[in-house]
Amino acid sequence: MLNNIVITDEERKLFLSWTALDEDLAEVEPDLAEAVLRSRLDFARGDLSRTDYWHDPEGIDVFEDVPYVDDGTRAHRLDLYLPHDSVVRGGKTTPVYIDIHGGGFVYSYKELNRNFCTNLAKLGFAVFSVNYRPAPETDFLGQLEDVAAAFRWIRIHRHEYPIDQNNVFLTGDSAGGTLALYMTAIERSGKFAKAMGVGQSGLTVAGSAFVSPLADLTPYLALCEPGTRKTIEESKETSIVEHIAPTFFAKLHAKKTELTNLATMAEEVEFPPILINTSSDDFIHVESLKLATALVAAGHDVELHDWYTHKGQSLGHVFPVCMSWLDESRETLRMIHDFAYARI
């Protein structure tokens, strides 16, 4: 219990199956720890109503909790979901998606995205789902370094699995979309990789599919300026990303690079084909539109799916990931499939 925040034993047992709670907050300053824990609990209680729908479709082989860094930590593990037919046939032809989960940079592990990943695998993909350290355990650049380490592990070990050795696509939702965007840029641009201080893995990214990505970091980098730190009372009116921004983005802000500007990023990086999915009632709807606009203005190949929600209807944020059983989600998964298969 932190500052009278109550977590029942039942909640703790269940929520820990897909997210950190307070076990990494003991050394964190109290107001930040409280904001993070409240956000994790709010997110987890929201996801709880969907757990009855979580299941693995038939015909998917699962390789769980493979360490990509041998340090024994949960945050440095990945899963691989493979169509059983690919295992039986034993070829090297199944194209690859690497999924990076979201959660406001503070919430969830790969388990939260399992339903999305297994349903994507069912359509004919090998899907790697990667963990990374949540904030405040590390910062934005630390999360990029974690994901890059997972990418390097995949490059080194991919020959051990019946998967395509060349066709690798990325996907990520919300904050995971941010990490997927930045990792796409890192893998496609030595200049961008150097600016971030994150080494390239050697994987060739053939395309990326972003679901409701948080694309524009410039408002959060501005919060790293002196005197902008919000108190816990003020932060109740803002997002968890705004609350963690002064520390979470501090090292990125210190780099003073123009490459975090979407227009500059789009002009400087040789992006592969990009798919972006959002909905009109996505609370960060504008982020997808800003990213698509910047990429199109720079001449990149962009496929934008902007679902319009009518009165009485709701799709919301990252709906294909958190509610993969919806008809709209199944159609989105099919579009993500078609996007990749058209480019292999």
What are these regions (language model features)?
Residues 1-344:
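Alpha/beta-hydrolase superfamily serine-hydrolase fold, recognizing
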